From Swiss-Prot:
The chain crosses the membrane at residues 59-79, 110-130, 149-169. Regulates membrane-cell wall junctions and localized cell wall deposition. Required for establishment of the Casparian strip membrane domain (CSD) and the subsequent formation of Casparian strips, a cell wall modification of the root endodermis that determines an apoplastic barrier between the intraorganismal apoplasm and the extraorganismal apoplasm and prevents lateral diffusion. Glycans are attached at N173. Belongs to the Casparian strip membrane proteins (CASP) family. It is a multi-pass membrane protein. Pfam families: CASP_dom. One of its GO terms (biological process) is cell wall organization. This is Casparian strip membrane protein 4. Residues 80-109, 170-205 are extracellular. Keywords: Cell membrane, Cell wall biogenesis/degradation, Glycoprotein, Membrane, Transmembrane, Transmembrane helix.
Length: 205
């Protein structure tokens, strides 16, 4: 009996120790990612940038050559059309039969438009050189694209209108009583065909 009593007393006297509960996320070791090799990343980015600059410089050189050819073509078309004229060998006391580009407003606008386009292409060559020296520069390329689009529209309008006049001059139109003047002014029409083909080549460039 004494042993049981002493045992029960010891159980009552012994303090109950509770194990602390670990909250989630506490007491756990954090796993850190290995440090990134920034030097390798920067080197790879630099190599990609150099390769991109290389092919963009090649495109800029090709663009410069095309602009130079297109400028020469536009100037040649305007000069050829402006110097095209023919005077018939026969004349009267009051009349002298001659043909000039100023006789048709369409041909006059053709000369003006090609002069403007040729001047623009000449002035755009320095911007093209900037694109060669700085191939990753965006503003010069964007400026050239916008201006090229506008100039190509002007060239297409002038060339299309001139093509219609050239067709009427060669074939005429019976509905509007337009006589084929190329039967009388053959040399004038032959010289006028060459300037009309030059803007077509210019649009290709």
């Amino acid at each position: 009996m004494d042993i049981e009593k002493t045992g029960s007393r010891r159980e009552e006297e012994e303090p109950i120790v509770q194990k602390p509960k670990l909250e989630k996320g506490k007491g756990k070791a954090h796993v850190f990612a290995p440090p990134m090799n920034y030097s390798r990343i920067m080197e790879k980015h630099k190599q990609e940038k150099v390769s991109m600059a290389g092919w963009k410089r090649g495109v800029a050189i090709f663009d410069f050559v095309l602009r130079l050819i297109a400028a020469i073509t536009a100037m040649a078309a305007a000069a050829k059309m402006a110097t095209t004229e023919e005077t018939l060998p026969f004349f009267t006391q009051f009349l002298q039969f001659s043909a000039d580009y100023t006789d048709l407003p369409t041909l006059s606008s053709f000369v003006i438009v090609n002069s403007i386009v040729g001047g623009y292409l000449t002035l755009s060559l320095p911007f093209s050189i900037v694109c060669i020296l700085r191939p990753l520069a965006v503003p010069p390329r964007l400026f050239l694209i916008l201006c090229d689009t506008a100039m190509m529209g002007l060239t297409m309008v002038a060339a299309s209108a001139s093509a219609a006049i050239v067709y009427l001059a060669h074939n005429g139109n019976s509905s509007s009583n337009w006589l084929p003047v190329c039967q009388q002014f053959g040399d004038f029409c032959k010289e006028r065909v060459a300037p009309w083909w030059l803007p077509l080549l210019q649009r290709l460039f």
